[in-house]
C-alpha cells in the first residue's frame, strides 16, 4: 500500500507524525488533497482543519491557525504557530474567544487594531467550523 509520511508541527510540539494514505487541508487558493508521490509544493495554508487518512484507514483531524505546507513525493510537512488535535478542541473556549474578537473589532480605533481583530475572528470562526466538522466525522 502506498503511504506518505506526514508531520504536523506547532510552535510548541509535534502534533502528528506518521504514515498516511491521504491528507486534505485548506490551501490559500482552496482545498488541497495530497496523495503519495504528489508533485513537490510549498504554499501557505489558511486556518482550518487538516484531515489525515492514516495508513490503517482511521482519520486524524488537526486544527491549524494557518501556516506553511511543504510537500515532497514521500513527505508532507505542516508548520503552524497554533495546531490543536481535533479531540482537544473546546467549542466553549473558541466561542468565547470569537465573541472577544468581535468585541475587539467593534472597539478598534486604528487599522492595526482592526486587522488584528479581523485575523483573530477569522481564526476562531475557522476553529469552530473545524470542530463541527470533526464532530460530524466521529
From Swiss-Prot:
Membrane topology term: Peripheral membrane protein
Pfam families referenced in this protein's UniProt entry, alphabetically: ATP-synt_DE (PF00401), ATP-synt_DE_N (PF02823)
Localization, UniProt: Cell inner membrane
Record flagged with keyword Manganese: no
KW Ion transport (keyword) present: yes
GO molecular function, one term: ATP binding
Primary subcellular site in the record, as a coarse category: membrane
Subunit structure, interactors included: F-type ATPases have 2 components, CF(1) - the catalytic core - and CF(0) - the membrane proton channel. CF(1) has five subunits: alpha(3), beta(3), gamma(1), delta(1), epsilon(1). CF(0) has three main subunits: a, b and c.
Similarity remark: Belongs to the ATPase epsilon chain family.
NCBIfam families: ATP_synt_epsi, PRK00571.1-4
Known function: Produces ATP from ADP in the presence of a proton gradient across the membrane.
Protein name: ATP synthase epsilon chain
Organism per entry: Polaromonas naphthalenivorans (strain CJ2)
Protein encoded by which gene: atpC
Amino acid at each position: 500500500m502506498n503511504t506518505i509520511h506526514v508531520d504536523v508541527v506547532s510552535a510548541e510540539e509535534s502534533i502528528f507524525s506518521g504514515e498516511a494514505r491521504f491528507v486534505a487541508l485548506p490551501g490559500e487558493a482552496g482545498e488541497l488533497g495530497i496523495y503519495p508521490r504528489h508533485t513537490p509544493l510549498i504554499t501557505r495554508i489558511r486556518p482550518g482543519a487538516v484531515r489525515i487518512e492514516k495508513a490503517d484507514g482511521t482519520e486524524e483531524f488537526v486544527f491549524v491557525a494557518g501556516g506553511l505546507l511543504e510537500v515532497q513525493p514521500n513527505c508532507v510537512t505542516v508548520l503552524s504557530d497554533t495546531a490543536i488535535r481535533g479531540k482537544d478542541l473546546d467549542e466553549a473556549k473558541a466561542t468565547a474567544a470569537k465573541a472577544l474578537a468581535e468585541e475587539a473589532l467593534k472597539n478598534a480605533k486604528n487599522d492595526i487594531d482592526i486587522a488584528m481583530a479581523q485575523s483573530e475572528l477569522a481564526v476562531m470562526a475557522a476553529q469552530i467550523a473545524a470542530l463541527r466538522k470533526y464532530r460530524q466525522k466521529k
